């Protein structure tokens, strides 16, 4: 299987992956258009496109509210809705098509099939939980809950690191494996014409399975984000 490379651009010491940037902007655009389209001319009795939006919204609220609590849920409901939609689209983009030039430059893929991208997403989630902890409870109380008693500090640091790493590796492993398998099945169809029906059927079945797994991973990522955030902002006052 030929190795593909993503186009990059450097601005000083900073290197930007153009494929990842393009895919991210595309995802944000799709989410914006979907929410704008589905929320236009809303009525008290939902119908059609409004039903779709409300179903997705209720679904996301249903599995995140137990972790955040009703007290704070209204402040984070849109965040979790957008996060879930972002992860669903990001995980499935690479299954839709391939856009690669003759020299191996890749212009289309799931951004979550890139480990650096997933590590960045995971880091932002962990950073968000700490920022919200400080904003909700104050810097002093947040630090105290993290460092008291003193002997648990190493365990707290290890917990934060494992949360960060597991969140990234889980999504990367599943999405990357799905794209690799899809590429292998596509290559199989190029070996001989009699392999084409087999490769087509196998790829169709694998794509359906990958879409299911991708949606499950989006659910898990959003769920764990709500768990981590809830643990930071719902600590009982002493």
Swiss-Prot record:
Molecular function GO terms recorded: proton-transporting ATP synthase activity, rotational mechanism
Membrane-topology descriptor: Multi-pass membrane protein
Gene Ontology process terms (BP): proton motive force-driven plasma membrane ATP synthesis; response to antibiotic
Annotated localization: Cell membrane
GO cellular component terms, semicolon-separated: plasma membrane; proton-transporting ATP synthase complex
Induction per the UniProt record: Induced by a decrease in external pH from 7.5 to 5.7.
CDD domains cross-referenced by the UniProt entry: ATP-synt_Fo_a_6
Keywords: Antibiotic resistance, ATP synthesis, Cell membrane, CF(0), Hydrogen ion transport, Ion transport, Membrane, Transmembrane, Transmembrane helix, Transport
Pfam (any one): ATP-synt_A
TM spans (from-to): 15-35, 76-96, 111-131, 167-187, 208-230
Family of this protein: Belongs to the ATPase A chain family.
Function summary: Key component of the proton channel; it plays a direct role in the translocation of protons across the membrane.
HAMAP family: ATP_synth_a_bact
Quaternary structure and interacting proteins, as annotated: F-type ATPases have 2 components, CF(1) - the catalytic core - and CF(0) - the membrane proton channel. CF(1) has five subunits: alpha(3), beta(3), gamma(1), delta(1), epsilon(1). CF(0) has three main subunits: a(1), b(2) and c(9-12). The alpha and beta chains form an alternating ring which encloses part of the gamma chain. CF(1) is attached to CF(0) by a central stalk formed by the gamma and epsilon chains, while a peripheral stalk is formed by the delta and b chains.
Protein name as annotated: ATP synthase subunit a
Species whose genome carries this gene: Streptococcus pneumoniae (strain ATCC BAA-255 / R6)
């Amino acid at each position: 299987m030929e190795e593909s490379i993503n186009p990059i651009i450097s601005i000083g010491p900073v290197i930007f992956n153009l494929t990842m940037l393009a895919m991210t902007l595309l995802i944000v655009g799709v989410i914006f258009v979907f929410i704008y389209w589905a929320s236009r001319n809303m009525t008290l009795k939902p119908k059609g496109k409004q039903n779709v939006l409300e179903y997705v919204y209720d679904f996301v609220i249903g599995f995140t509210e137990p972790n955040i609590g009703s007290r704070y849920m209204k402040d984070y409901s849109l965040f979790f809705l957008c996060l879930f939609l972002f992860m669903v689209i990001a995980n499935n983009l690479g299954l839709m098509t391939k856009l690669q030039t003759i020299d191996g430059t890749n212009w289309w893929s799931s951004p979550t099939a890139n480990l650096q991208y997933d590590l960045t997403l995971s880091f932002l989630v962990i950073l968000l939980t700490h920022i919200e902890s400080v904003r909700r409870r104050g810097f002093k109380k947040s630090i105290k809950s993290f460092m008291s008693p003193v002997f648990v500090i190493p365990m707290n640091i290890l917990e934060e690191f494992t949360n960060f790493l597991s969140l990234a590796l889980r999504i990367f492993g599943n999405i990357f494996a799905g794209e690799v398998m899809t590429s292998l099945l596509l290559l199989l169809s190029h070996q001989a014409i009699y392999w084409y029906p087999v490769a087509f059927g196998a790829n169709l079945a694998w794509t359906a399975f990958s879409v299911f797994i991708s949606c499950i991973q989006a659910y898990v990522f959003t769920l764990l984000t709500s768990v981590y955030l809830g643990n930071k902002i719902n600590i009982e006052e002493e």
